[in-house]
């Protein structure tokens, strides 16, 4: 079948799609066979009714089948958020990724330019001098030599060009906000995944379990798709097929609670300058929330036994200059292509 209309009708009637039907529908979308109106109707019908675990698994299957892959070490991790939380914070996961890389854990970071915010990972890294226009071989070399490689989503998921304009015109969250973190081109099995709403914490952990992930935390922190320092973070931790739920507070990281305003960012240039300032030694709320996310990532990757050890390793990555060196090497290797 190469017609999306039957699937639009089914979802509009509030029927759930099987994994097979969901994959077929997204294959149609990603092949370019659906019109913008059909895509918009399908995405919003899913959004209003609520996407199911099976629909997300099927959609991810379609995305992964068409993506441009990257080779990364078995122990690589991704630190990624769905975006779409509307909070306008700094690029928290970007700085956390550099801290983790500086601590010796390879990071295969998947991200994009901002869609619904002022600055995505790609915007900040580009402003810092990282070359985003590189192929899989160079990205693999970045991971090997800098400890961090950035996979620009639009280059690895070229089929997304068929939905990009519709997503921008809709201007609201869709299933694609959920799919990006689940379709890492390096096939990482360890991830810290932030989601834009608390109701997605458990379902995305189930999706990642069904997709074969090994060690994952899916988190939501009081309106943020990150572990937050503003209050309570809900966590679904997947380890070897078992999902455990718990909550975290800033005190669990030895940190003070802060206001959301302290975490507000700006455009790519603004956020890049703030990130560089932390690497240069600034101690502020942006540093602290990134340390917390890095500490959790080091636990997920098995480098730290608990959050206290994770925080110590993360702080050492900054104080020793490890995180700063990771960025410098990433800039150098990416531009040597």
From Swiss-Prot:
Mg(2+) 2 binds at residues 225-226. 5-phospho-alpha-D-ribose 1-diphosphate binds at residues 81, 84-85, 89, 91-94, 109-117, 121. It holds the Pfam family Glycos_transf_3. It is an enzyme of class 2 (transferase). InterPro entries: Anthranilate_Pribosyl_Tfrase, Glycosyl_Trfase_fam3, Glycosyl_Trfase_fam3_N_dom, Glycosyl_Trfase_fam3_N_dom_sf, Nuc_phospho_transferase. It catalyses: N-(5-phospho-beta-D-ribosyl)anthranilate + diphosphate = 5-phospho-alpha-D-ribose 1-diphosphate + anthranilate. Belongs to the anthranilate phosphoribosyltransferase family. This is Anthranilate phosphoribosyltransferase. It comes from Rhizobium meliloti (strain 1021).
